[in-house]
Amino acid sequence: PNQEAKAIIIAIHGRDSRGFEWIYPLQTIDNELTKTYFFRWDTTKCPQKIIPNLLKEILAMKDIEKITVLGHSYGGIVSSLLLNEIEGIETEIHVIAAPLASSDLKKYCGYIHPITKNNNVSYFQWRTIKKLDNAFNSLDYDPQLINFKESSVFLLPNQYKGKRLGHLWSISWVADNINLD
């Protein structure tokens, strides 16, 4: 990455991920104007527990003018917890196929999606079609559905490059279609 870059991209993986699903998306969105980071975290822990460490890493970066966070699945939960944490820097938070209304996370971790966001933060939800998403299609509800007025919501199509657009392919589709300018 360019050492003088004023913009950063932070990718945050989901549960039980080794990160392979991020190779194509990060190659697609990485450019000479940004520094790109992949944040690894222990997904056996509640997402709230890693926010102080992630925030410390972000705030330690100097002269940053724009932050773009891309969180997939449980990584989207982590990303959502930054909505009220980053101040004074233009920030985009993109949650991709994220179980923001997960009853399990609420039950075991006390997770509740934030109800507000800072004014410098733009929030984007990229939702898969539940019946095509093997992480969600066995549930009796769609864990992606939350009511957050200050967000832009996009429903992904049913196919990507001729294949079913499910949970993991959602990151690649977003990488091909996102506008990071």
Question: Where does each model-flagged region fall?
Answer:
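Flexible, membrane-associating and regulatory peripheral segments of lipid-active enzymes
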Residues: 1-10, 16-19, 34-37, 57-60, ...
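The serine-hydrolase catalytic nucleophile loop
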Residues: 19-25
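Alpha-helical and His/Cys-centered functional microenvironments
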Residues: 17, 76, 171
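Serine-dependent carboxylesterase/thioesterase catalytic core
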Residues: 9, 29, 41-44, 48-134
